[in-house]
Amino acid sequence: MSPTNKEHSAGGVILENGSVLLIQMQNLKGEKVWTFPKGHLEPGETAEEAAVREVEEETGWFCEIESDLYRAEYSFEREGELVDKDVRWFLMKRAGGDGIPKTPDEIFDMKWLTLADAENELLYRSDLAIIDLLKHY
């Protein structure tokens, strides 16, 4: 196995009236999964800038950050290489946009769900940890 690669990503969790916005996308195994919008930091970009950009690209909503929410650190294997990933999550509110994803080839669907319903749809440990945090907001 080759040396470990490091990746930094950021994402946003839009919470409105007790519901969160989830996106459906394809994971590395080719399966459709529900998750929160996120993506890699571009060179020179802060985590906050990346989160706002990714949420707008993947949901069509321009959002403002309300607070730092969660940090996930985990490792996984991709094409025989170990990747150490660091993801910063921000709590956001909608401030404009049309709700039409700018990356329709990546996003299959979007839906608003209550925290309880979202918990039943989400598979990733970090996403479920975010739901647990939001229950106490």
What are the residue ranges of the model-derived segments?
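A small-molecule sensor/coupling module
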Residues: 130-137
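Generic leucine side-chain signal with a strong bias for well-ordered alpha-helical environments
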Residues: 21-22, 41, 122, 134
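Residue-level marker of positions within ordered structural domains that often coincide
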Residues: 17, 95, 136
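N-terminal strand-loop-strand
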Residues: 1-36
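Unchanged
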Residues: 41-67, 72-129
